[in-house]
């Protein structure tokens, strides 16, 4: 897979911003991507050294608008831990 197909977008929340101090960055990734593909994609796109990749599948939430019901799509989140000697990812600064 192309690295741009693996990493969809950064996930910026209050909790993920706090984790950046510990060299941990959060991304929304492709649902069919595995940890090895995610690690390679981050290293190629941002030029950093990855120590660890944690992934989790996020279930879509039910939504309702008047009489219409539906749900948000399910997605996959990855928390990337960088090595201590690696530089920070510029995208988050």
Swiss-Prot record:
Gene Ontology MF terms: rRNA binding; structural constituent of ribosome
Coiled coil stretches, renumbered: none
Superkingdom in the source lineage: Bacteria
PROSITE patterns according to UniProt: RIBOSOMAL_L23
Keyword Ribosomal protein among record annotations: yes
Biological function: One of the early assembly proteins it binds 23S rRNA. One of the proteins that surrounds the polypeptide exit tunnel on the outside of the ribosome. Forms the main docking site for trigger factor binding to the ribosome.
Name of the molecule in the record: Large ribosomal subunit protein uL23
Organism: Natranaerobius thermophilus (strain ATCC BAA-1301 / DSM 18059 / JW/NM-WN-LF)
